[in-house]
């Protein structure tokens, strides 16, 4: 199974392939550069991979895992915070039969949701105390066994956790090579979400065969150039 279908999923499939090729989203000045040879190779690989899948448009990773969990698909790539669904799913017929490995190319993405405290919080001290408890070494085993991802190193060496979620040990070894998304000071109106909206739209068109990879990247570059305004110091 291969994820495709929304503004988060499609870039998350495309970007590890781009980084594997040595490509980047921004040049040294911070200008968005998606119409490159590296991006073309990455997009072609994404398209070829999708052609070998069940060709279902999965818009979230939980749906991607359904075909894998019921045994109808042999392989999938997913963020580890979704992987616990494989074992928790009532459909799962593969418990105890799993293999796992770092993402091909060795350039996984670092991302995911986090818990935070809003500026308007009426009781910030209480909220901080809750987060201290939630992310403590004492809470980490239960938090992780329930499918969460703890920042505590102790969780990744816990025997019960390693037996239930064996891929977490491999995931921890991948953290140093994980790639993070970054912003850009090149533009006065830069928005990471808007950039991903544009990128996702054209990546999906290429993967689904609506246009060629070459056309998709050229059109994505043109739309980003038109949408984002460079700061005067870069003109």
Region roles according to the model:
Residues 56-70:
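Short helix-initiation/N-cap motifs at beta->coil->alpha
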